[in-house]
Regions:
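Alpha-helical interface subdomain recognition
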Residues: 1-117
Length: 117
């Protein structure tokens, strides 16, 4: 799993350098890398037992840092939403629908609110 996460990070970095829209791939790479790291660190914590929570060993710091990385640049749940959004956007573009839903919000503040009764 660690090698797969590392490989996906390299692919995402290349896509960020060369592609116009690497959002889905970058979101997938971040999600997979943080979940894989969390699994590895959680296993290390299980092996260490109660002593793993103390600052005698660096496992507790790795656990805190990993958890922060799962939250800091967007939670993994938000990454799921981004991945789904980009995936469906790619499908819609393949079907010929060219509407960009992100542009819908550009003039939204100028339009009067719709009230449905």
């Amino acid at each position: 799993k660690l090698d797969a996460a590392r490989g996906l990070n390299y692919v995402a970095a290349r896509a960020a350098d060369t592609s116009d829209n690497p959002r889905r791939l970058v979101s997938e790479a971040k999600k997979v890398a943080t979940e894989t790291a969390w699994e590895a660190i959680n296993n290390a914590m299980q092996i260490m037992g109660g002593i793993g929570y103390t600052n005698i060993y660096p496992v507790e710091k790795y656990l805190r840092d990993c958890r922060l990385s799962m939250i800091w640049t967007g939670t993994n749940e938000i990454m799921n939403l981004l991945i789904q959004h980009e995936y469906y956007k790619e499908l819609a573009a393949a079907d010929g629908e060219v509407r960009d839903v992100e542009l819908d919000a550009v003039g939204a503040d100028e339009v009067e609110e719709k009230v449905y009764e």
